[in-house]
Amino acid sequence: MSTERLLLSDKYKAFLRCDVPTEFLEGTTAAGKTPVGLFKFILKVAESPKKLHILAADDTGAAEKNIIQKDLGILDDFGVLVEYKGNGSGEYKMPHLLFHTSGGDKIIFVVGYGNKRKWKDALGGQYGCLYIDEINTADIEFVREAAMRSDYLMATLNPDDPGLDVYKE
């Protein structure tokens, strides 16, 4: 675990209390979008009545490096409450996080949106929470399909061309 601590400002606490179905965190590289968004995303997963959720990045390697295993990432922040099953396990053959909550275990599938064949296989049901890292680089078909199947969406993005579909939709 990291020796860094996640300190919560009054503004951050207000953000955590804000209950909306869709949230976008836009800012420059290293602005802190990921640690801020991930923490709230995991809290939303814990509150969700649904068991299945999705965490998406360009590919699973990017998700592991930038989201799951980084300092102040999911494993760092939630420790023994979360197990990463990078090769899948048991009932679920695709990479996922097993999140132990007081309401029972939750599954967070780790999906790469860079390969259409793989994400097409991953989508096919209803999900509680969806986290899309760098949504401005994601396949817009993935964004549409995944968002339609989820109750809550948290997305991060770096400033980009305002003409992109992700800004229009």
Predicted features and spans:
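Phosphate/NTP-binding elements of NTP-utilizing enzymes
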Residues: 1-169
